[in-house]
């Protein structure tokens, strides 16, 4: 992440956000106000941190607001405040966890917070994008969507305070423009850019020059079959990146066997470097952070794209939902026997919640990947107001010489949460 020179203003911005929320609290006609406090410990490499985080949630019909005041203290440095939490203006995302607005039955939607699993259109340019996987950085991003009859506009920026990834998507129902509503056929256009994208590393392995990366494309999909249980929709995308280009032809199928819902995607791809399918994906933030960090770099996206003879490749994605359980698995061929794979699982069983996320990047079957990432969090609620949690993350990577490095972090603690406006007890 690019560290902003305006970092000293970050604590003041956090204070102003909390003051505004406290002023709005008595006037908001909320369905639910809640307050929580977390206490815990965290380990990053050899550093031990003590966590204190109070938070406030306001839920209303038009908007939702979640604020936090996360404080981490270095247990090996006289419990001084962990400076990395407040060394950039973009760390405002630590305070404003969510500000969402929904008006006119969802015709306009706005979200401010840390962007996670963001996808545009068919996901051939922006697929599952996560703004930050750095435990010391939580940028404040924005995503907005406007629906005007048969036209839908969507825009996103990964960090409102920094020159990072931004883009937009336009979806159009062309038949509906000239007659009755027909929402089976869609035309899409997508534009995404990163003004300071990672470039090639120098010969000594250190950071090279950055450059603009601009990707754009058009797409078409048509739901040829749509019933209560089935939906089948072929699609086609044509995308461009400088001298590079790519074509995507795929099939989306949704099947409902209550309470189970399955979604399957099968996609054929043909690409010419420097274009790469799913360029802004779940691992892009890792590469970006590595690029701006000092020292030797792992294999960069730009170099990997240039080295792969893309030609023909494919992708398979499966999603399953059944009540409190959901899972998504993706396997994508990258050319030259290289693959990307990821899996996401969310489960709820009574007072217990579990979330698991894993990804392998640029791997051959039977060989180590260039990068591997695993995240997991478990949460258990007890005694009505109390809960405990355990979270852990592992990042593994290879540099150009084949040397491996790993970053492991974990945290655990307890918290208490209670309603500020509990519902009245029913009359007996």
Segment roles from a protein language model:
Residues 1-10:
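N-terminal secretory signal peptides that target proteins for export/translocation
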Residues 14-24:
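Bacterial N-terminal signal peptides
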Residues 30-55:
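Short glycine/proline- and aromatic-enriched beta-strand/turn motifs that initiate or cap beta-hairpins
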Residues 32-34, 47, 59, 64, ...:
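Signature for the C-terminal beta-barrel architecture of outer-membrane proteins
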Residues 49-75:
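Glycine- and aromatic-enriched membrane insertion/assembly motifs of diderm outer-membrane
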Residues 65-98, 125:
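Surface-exposed loop and membrane-interface regions of Gram-negative outer-membrane beta-barrel proteins
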Residues 99, 170, 406-428:
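Outer-membrane beta-barrel "beta-signal"
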Residues 110-119, 156:
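Mobile, glycine-rich extracellular loop/lid and propeptide segments
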């Amino acid at each position: 992440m690019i560290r902003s020179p305006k970092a000293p203003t970050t604590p003041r911005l956090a204070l102003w956000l909390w003051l505004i929320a406290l002023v709005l609290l008595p006037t908001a006609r909320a369905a639910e106000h809640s307050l929580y406090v977390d206490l815990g410990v965290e380990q990053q490499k050899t550093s031990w941190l003590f966590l204190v985080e109070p938070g406030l949630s306001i839920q209303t019909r038009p908007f939702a607001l979640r604020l936090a005041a996360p404080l981490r203290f270095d247990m090996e440095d006289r419990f001084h405040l962990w400076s990395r939490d407040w060394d950039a203006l973009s760390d405002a995302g630590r305070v404003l966890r969510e500000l969402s607005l929904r008006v006119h039955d969802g015709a306009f939607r706005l979200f401010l917070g840390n962007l996670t699993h963001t996808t545009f259109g068919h996901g051939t340019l922006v697929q599952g994008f996560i703004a930050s996987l750095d435990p010391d950085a939580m940028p404040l991003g924005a995503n907005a969507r406007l629906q005007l009859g048969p036209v839908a506009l969507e825009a996103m920026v990964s960090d409102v305070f920094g020159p990072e990834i931004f883009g937009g998507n336009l979806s159009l129902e062309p038949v509906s423009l000239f007659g009755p509503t027909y929402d089976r056929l869609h035309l899409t256009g997508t534009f995404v850019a990163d003004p300071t994208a990672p470039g090639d590393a120098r010969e000594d392995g250190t950071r090279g020059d950055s450059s603009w990366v601009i990707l754009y494309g058009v797409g078409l999909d048509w739901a040829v079959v749509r019933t209560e249980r089935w939906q089948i929709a072929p699609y086609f995308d044509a995308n461009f990146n400088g001298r590079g280009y790519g074509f995507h032809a795929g099939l989306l199928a949704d099947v409902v066997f209550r309470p189970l819902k399955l979604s399957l995607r099968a996609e054929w791809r043909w690409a010419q470097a420097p274009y790469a399918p799913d360029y802004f994906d779940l691992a892009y933030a890792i590469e970006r952070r590595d690029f701006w960090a000092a020292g030797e770099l792992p294999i960069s996206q730009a170099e990997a794209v240039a080295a792969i003879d893309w030609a023909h490749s494919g992708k398979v994605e499966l999603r399953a939902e059944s009540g409190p359980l959901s899972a998504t698995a993706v396997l994508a061929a990258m050319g030259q026997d290289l693959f990307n794979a990821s899996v996401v699982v969310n489960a709820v069983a009574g007072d217990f919640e579990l979330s698991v996320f894993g990804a392998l990047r640029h791997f051959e079957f039977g060989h180590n990947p260039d990068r591997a990432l695993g995240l997991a969090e478990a949460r258990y609620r007890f005694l009505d107001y109390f809960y405990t949690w355990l979270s852990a993350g592992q990042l593994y990577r290879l540099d150009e010489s084949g040397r491996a490095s790993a970053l492991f972090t974990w945290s655990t603690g307890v918290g208490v949460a209670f309603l500020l406006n509990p519902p009245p007890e029913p009359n007996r």
